[in-house]
Amino acid sequence: MNKFKFFILFAIVFSSCKKEVKNNNIFLGGQIINPSSSYLILHKNNSTIDCLLLDSNNFFQKKFNNLESGFYKIEHIPEYQTIFLEPGDSLWLRVNAVEFKQSIVYSGKGSSKNNFLIQNDISNEIENEFLSSKYSLKNNLFSNIIDSLVLQKKNQWKNMDSINNLSKYAQKVTMAAYVYNYANLRERYALLRGANWSQSEKKKYFKYRYFLNFEETDLSSFDPYIDYMLNYLSEQSLDSSNYYFKTKQNTDFNIKRLKIVENNIIGRELKNNLARAIAYDEILNFDNHSQHENFLQYYFAVNSNTRFLGEVLSLHNDIKKMNVGSILPRIFIQNSKLDTISSNEILNKKPTIIYFWSQTQMNQYRKTLKVIEKIKIKKPEYRFVGISIQPLNKMVLKVNKMLGLDKKDQYAIINFENASKKWIITLLNKSIILDSNGNIVNGFANIFDLELLNEL
């Protein structure tokens, strides 16, 4: 992937970092190029900390007096990125929303650890593409490749650590970023290829587990660690006679994962985070909806976080409202005149397909429009309504006009958090099929599904 190289901004506020005075505050600021909205949100542990507004030049900044050391997420719809903050940090970031992850550059106190994390994340994506062709190798050859990559990252980490005065916590986090990523790849290989391994093969292959910790309370909300633990739980839950990609679709498989969490994970926060992730995997598998009441009984027994419980139950109930025959839940949207209207107003007594797109993912948008054109030829009686997940502006309206789209069929979401909850918008390839009365035919269709035409 191409990387944008930005000129790093240094603000006057950083001059205060030169003083030999202990500072327990955390400063966070920066600039977003080509923003998709007028704000970004700071999260911790899946809870909103603050909403940071962009000024007329798309800058934001705020000093926090009581933030703890740990992992935070900055969200600029539809993108987000994890950052690691500690008291005394004065972190600036610059990002182009069109190439969000690839363009992030940090500067200021606390930048070295975060630049290491983002570059590690980007290189992991490149390596994963390379490794996708290596899963056919024997396990010893695959392990050798991973060992080589681990050594390379370890040397990069040593170099970074040697020129920065990192805290013990920051050292642990930056090291864990690559250690658990590669451990995760090993677990994934085992899920795909390890069904018929002998005990001696398993013992040799899984020896890396002896160096890992399954009770990392400091990493309980760190994505590389959680991703590893989820694949580890999957490997532990998979019977030798089962095929992973088929088995993981079953509710019983996720119940088994919950039971392993309950019986083997002691730390409450880690246990709740793992259970929440498993619950989302299951509840968002719409084909299993009839079995979710049973699944939730097991989830209730494992989870002790009331907020997570409310989230999962709310998601389950919102999915019910999107079932076949239901009336599409009402949200407020923006029309091409930039007026706010009710979503009920887009209905016009014609069967309708609603599709979604993002102003920061134009390649996806073009692919979607090509699919829509093909469907139009075979199903001319349908109306096709495009909804941007960010509010419209004059530039977007101009682009849609250049693409030959009827502005009467183009709308935008005003409050993504509310809309994504009510309409269960988790992926941009989601589409909603309505009959001529506005009732739901399929609330969870995939616009790129080859079987979509058969539903119309």
Identify the meaning behind each predicted range.
Residues 1-27, 443:
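Bacterial Sec-dependent N-terminal signal peptides
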Residues 17-173, 186:
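A non-transmembrane, solvent-exposed segment enriched in polar/low-complexity residues
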Residues 253-324:
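N-terminal targeting signals for export/organelle localization
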Residues 309-344, 406-407:
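N-terminal "domain-start" segment that seeds a small globular fold
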Residues 341-372, 385:
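Short active-site neighborhood of thiol/selenol oxidoreductases, capturing the structured segment around
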Residues 363-403, 415-419:
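Structural microenvironment flanking redox-active thiols in thiol-disulfide oxidoreductases
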Residues 400-436:
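Short, internal strand/loop/helix patches
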Residues 427-430, 436-456:
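Non-catalytic, surface beta->alpha helical segment in thiol-disulfide oxidoreductase systems
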